[in-house]
């Protein structure tokens, strides 16, 4: 039997998908901009 691949960690989640992580790169800023334009309630993790 194989182990479950999803091992949740809030720290890892924030570091890779958080708002500050998004704003650190050009691509991430584009992600935030797209989500703002779409009207998402949550912009990032």
UniProtKB/Swiss-Prot annotation:
The keyword Iron does not apply. Residues 1-21 are annotated as: Disordered. Residues 11-20 have a biased composition (Basic residues). One of its GO terms (biological process) is translation. Residues 1-10 have a biased composition (Polar residues). Keywords: Ribonucleoprotein, Ribosomal protein. GO terms for molecular function: structural constituent of ribosome. It comes from the Bacteria. One of its GO terms (cellular component) is ribosome. InterPro entries: Ribosomal_bL34, Ribosomal_bL34_CS. Belongs to the bacterial ribosomal protein bL34 family. NCBIfam families: rpmH_bact. HAMAP family: Ribosomal_bL34 (MF_00391). This is Large ribosomal subunit protein bL34. The lineage of its organism: Bacteria, Pseudomonadati, Pseudomonadota, Gammaproteobacteria, Alteromonadales. The gene is rpmH.
């Amino acid at each position: 039997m194989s182990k479950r691949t999803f091992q949740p960690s809030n720290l890892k989640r924030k570091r890779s998908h958080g708002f500050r992580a998004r704003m650190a790169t050009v691509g991430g800023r584009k992600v935030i901009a797209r989500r703002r334009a779409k009207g998402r309630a949550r912009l990032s993790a």
